Amino acid sequence: ADREIDLNGDLLMPAFKNAHTHSAMTFGRSFSDDLPLQSWLYDKIFPLEAKLTAEDIYHLSRLAFLEYLESGISACFDMYYFPEAMAKAAVDAGFRTVMCGAVNNFKESPALLEEYYNTYNNYHPLVSYQLGFHAEYTTNRSIMEAIAALAEKYKAPVYMHASETESEVQDCMGRYGMTPTALFEQLGLWNYGGSAFHSVWVSNEDLDIYKKHGVY
């Protein structure tokens, strides 16, 4: 070898990458963690998130980034609010972040998503931004259609939560007569790929859709 490093029994390897994070949610550790997802979100988390400021997000995100680095993680794919605070926290920590839109019925908008996309893909070498929204059950059809139009405009992938619980899938079937996965495909959200975070309750047909569009 051209170079040898004596690690005294330790391992030298490439850093880990965390592919789905909500870094600023360091505030929610062990908070009502005995509840079903929907109750936890609507009764506990969403009310708290409504009170968070950009300054809060900066400090909460920076705490997470420092912990990631300590754990051997050098980059994350982060879905949350106040990207200006998230981006600054990442740069200040020397951490690589790919931010993702978190649009829903009560926070952010497709217009703001497009603004963020153009701003934070030209912000700093450690920062980039992808199109995204929270989930089918928090985002109405018109918003999803507008995001699909952005995906087509920029030839960009789209990221969201999908099929995390059985009730989420059943409720979507009641609203649209199809699974979240089938709906997202119908709307053209994955014409350029993307991801469906969690995907616990998926059918074989859903998996075929993922394979077709390179969704992971």
Residue ranges and their predicted role:
Residues 1-13:
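Histidine-rich, glycine-flanked metal-binding segment
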Residues 3-5, 17, 98:
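Hydrophobic/aromatic beta-strand patches that form the interior of the parallel beta-sheet core
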Residues 7-8, 60-61, 79, 134, ...:
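Fold-independent oxyanion-binding glycine-rich loops
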Residues 14-26, 157-166:
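Histidine-centered catalytic micro-motifs
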Residues 29-94, 114-123:
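Alpha-helical scaffold segments that flank or form the walls of functional sites
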Residues 47-50, 133, 192, 214-216:
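Short, basic, glycine/proline-bearing loop/turn elements
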Residues 85-203:
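Metal-coordinating catalytic core of metallo-dependent amide/deamination hydrolases
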Residues 202-205, 210-216:
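A conserved active-site cap/scaffold subdomain adjacent to cofactor or substrate pockets
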